[in-house]
Amino acid sequence: GSPGACSPETSLNREWSIERARHTYSIPHWSEGYVDVGADGRLLVQPRGPGGPEVALAEVIAQARHRGLELPVLVRFVDILGDKLRRLQRAFGTAMADHDYDGAYTAIYPIKVNQHRNVASELVANGEHGFGLEAGSKPELMAVLALSRRGAIVVCNGYKDREFLRLALIGRRLGLDTHIVIEKPSELTVALEEAAALGVEPRFGVRLRLASLGAGKWQNTGGEKSK
């Protein structure tokens, strides 16, 4: 070869390593322990976090092709959702124990964040205790009522007409722990009327708005015109 040319053996290939691969692709900074580089250089996914079962992404792609699928394909590792939920609940549990807080913590997932059935179903399956769903519209509420287990907490937010309120109260008759968040007096009046008609005891929550206006990026979250 020409003077000064580097062969693969004396340049990049010789210097490449697992640690360099992790650093080059900043894997520790974005993976949260769910993705790593294996000893053979392949990308590994650990859906239940470090130390849990792992699968090489290349093997997933090979299986997809074997089944006749063509790339690109969308691969979802839904076990990550359950692990993230458990991490969240453990974090609050630890903080409450450290500060001698004797209350309870319930993780509420607003279904509007991701309405995909697999996402909501996986969270419900992993959140038997201390977990609930939030609905902000009639279509969302119907989906939440169908997904939730008996006794589960359901938070009802957003615009609430008579039909929405009646649907939320029907949830109580189905054995769900539905909470209607009251934002204006008229909602309370209608909810009480519908509760009496259905013969159920309603549960209400109240949305509080800060009267004072702060300063900074989020200053508009307070004051009389805040959401």
Model-derived segments and their meaning:
Residues 1-8:
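N-terminal amphipathic/basic-hydrophobic helices that include classical n-h-c signal peptides
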Residues 8-43:
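Charged, compositionally biased N-terminal leader segments and the immediate start
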Residues 12-13, 21, 55-66, 97-101, ...:
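A generic structural signal for ordered alpha-helices
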Residues 13-16, 22-24, 52-53, 86-87, ...:
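A short linear-motif detector with a strong N-terminal bias
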Residues 32, 37-115:
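Low-complexity, highly charged intrinsically disordered N-terminal segments
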Residues 99-227:
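Active-site-proximal beta-alpha core segment in soluble small-molecule metabolic enzymes
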